[in-house]
Amino acid sequence: VAVADLNAAGAAAVATEVQAAAPACQVFAQPVDVADAAAVQGLADEATRRFGQVDIFCSNAGIILRKGLEASADDWQRIWEINVMAHIHAARAVLPQMLERGDGYFVNTVSAAGLLSQIGSAPYAVTKHAAIGFAEWLSITYGDRGIKVSCICPQGVQTNMLFGEKGERKGFLQEGSVTAEHVAAVTLEGVADERFLILPHPEVLEYYRRKGQDYDRWLRGMRRLHDKVMQEFGGIAV
């Protein structure tokens, strides 16, 4: 197992936990900025050097900007590099070796926002749709050559992104949110079944069906939800 994080201490701590839980497992940690293609390639190269190959690449990093049209060009570029380009960097780094042996798996953390939308954050909604689009393309293009792809698409997950580092943040997705452990368990099941969409909140599938069945009705419903959220939580409501 290779553990990567922008925070070197955080990556090392997770690696230590993995090693304690599975003493026979080979583990290493490496600080990586996933927005940096060379850094992602370096991670893949080091994992390949240590382990011989990369079987599964879990592309998990993501950020949110609670902005709409006021988001600057720099804001858009930053979230694009992390929420979209990180997945592309991962594919570029390990797809060649996967294709050579005819087997490999990309597990990309995306969001239900990539299937639906995100009230309160235009950059998040747009980049998560793009992340789904890239994963679909990857599966369509290489699925018959042994490459498997899964997208994890939860709604609220009980992490610092949702609650803030000190639990100070309030938002409509906190109700009904699930633990990271729940997401992990559902993800393991989804990967075992080789499902493209992994939905820790099963109701998201029904929301997605309704969107496809009657887009205009879905948009009207989302506008009502938007108004309700803004009244209850104000402008920063994610």
Region spans (language model):
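Residue(s) in the substrate-gating loop at a strand-loop-helix junction
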Residues: 111
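Conserved glycine-rich Rossmann-like NAD(P)H-binding loop of the short-chain dehydrogenase/reductase
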Residues: 1-13
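Active-site helix of classical SDR
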Residues: 91, 127
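The beta1-alpha1 cofactor-binding region of Rossmann-like NAD(H)/NADP(H)-dependent oxidoreductases
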Residues: 8-9, 31-42, 73
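A glycine-rich helix->loop->beta "capping" turn
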Residues: 21-26, 46-57, 65
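Conserved mid-core segment of classical short-chain dehydrogenase/reductases
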Residues: 63-77, 120-123
